[in-house]
């Protein structure tokens, strides 16, 4: 949904996203064979990163920021059914939530406005993408107990996008060495918030501690 990649903006599917992530880590490892490789995923990217780690991505550690792990039994059957029906009947319908859903993603209002004007940012997900996100979150939840890489989880207490309980559950399920950083003034876009420098510093310190 973001960036300058060629081709149409279509949902590639969970398997493609996970495979692409694994391929990128292999490429980075090839180019920098003497450096550790850490995979960072934010929101949906956190779910993809967690699933990719379990699928054999060649990494030394994992960083999950506000990860999308609201899957498995956390998603009620009626919600799943509605998402499936929407993806089947109106797959390309985009949902803005305007007038119905009021969610603030960050306390950095100028950055939110800039993102809203950026043509490379697609903020309104389609029905197909909603269903795809659910599948990714299911994969991430199932993967967590099998992931043994050192993992740093980041979460903001003011996050209005990712609920805290699934993040806490995924953290507890992780099988390897793990660290949780919680930010009382943090929102969903932790790396764009007004205190983003604090978050980036914590990431850098954690990586240094792994060496």
Named regions from a protein language model:
Residues 177-211:
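Catalytic active-site module of serine/aspartate enzymes centered on a nucleophile-bearing elbow/loop
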Residues 42-126:
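Alpha/beta-hydrolase-fold enzymes
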Residues 125-143:
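Active-site nucleophile elbow and catalytic-triad environment of alpha/beta-hydrolase enzymes
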Residues 149, 163-172:
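Short alpha-helix in the alpha/beta-hydrolase fold that links the catalytic acid
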Residues 3-33:
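Catalytic nucleophile-loop/oxyanion-hole region of alpha/beta-hydrolase
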Residues 1-3, 69, 187:
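Alpha/beta-hydrolase active-site loop signature
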Residues 147, 153-155, 159:
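Short beta-strand/loop motif that positions the catalytic acidic residue
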Residues 32-43:
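Alpha/beta-hydrolase fold nucleophile elbow
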């Amino acid at each position: 949904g973001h960036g300058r990649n060629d081709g149409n903006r279509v949902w590639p599917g969970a398997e493609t996203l996970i495979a692409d992530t694994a391929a990128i880590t292999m490429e980075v490892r090839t180019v920098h064979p003497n450096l550790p490789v850490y995979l960072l995923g934010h929101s949906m990217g956190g779910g993809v990163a967690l699933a990719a780690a379990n699928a054999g991505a060649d990494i030394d550690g994992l960083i999950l920021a506000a990860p999308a792990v609201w899957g498995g039994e956390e998603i009620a059957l009626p919600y799943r059914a509605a998402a499936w029906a929407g993806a089947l009947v109106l797959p390309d319908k985009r949902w803005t939530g305007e007038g119905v859903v009021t969610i603030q993603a960050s306390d950095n209002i100028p950055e939110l406005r800039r993102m809203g004007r950026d043509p490379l940012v697609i903020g309104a997900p389609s029905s197909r993408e909603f269903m795809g996100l659910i599948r990714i979150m299911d994969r991430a939840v199932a993967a967590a107990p099998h992931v043994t890489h050192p993992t740093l989880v980041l979460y903001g207490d003011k996050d209005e996008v990712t609920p805290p309980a699934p993040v806490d559950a995924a953290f507890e399920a992780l099988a390897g060495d793990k660290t949780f950083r919680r930010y009382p003034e943090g929102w969903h876009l932790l790396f764009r918030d007004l205190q983003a420098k604090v978050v980036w510093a914590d990431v850098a310190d954690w990586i240094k501690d792994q060496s």
